[in-house]
From Swiss-Prot:
Keywords associated with the record: Neuropeptide, Secreted
GO cellular component: extracellular region
GO BP annotations listed: neuropeptide signaling pathway
Protein's UniProt keywords contain Manganese: no
Chief place of localization: secreted
Domain of life (superkingdom): Eukaryota
The keyword Hydrolase belongs to this UniProt entry's keyword annotation: no
Primary role: FMRFamides and FMRFamide-like peptides are neuropeptides.
Protein name per its UniProtKB record: Extended FMRFamide-10
Localization in the cell: Secreted
Similarity comment: Belongs to the FARP (FMRF amide related peptide) family.
Amino acid sequence: PASDSGFLRDP
């Protein structure tokens, strides 16, 4: 998800 670490990995 996008809300994981602060960067877009898999929105």
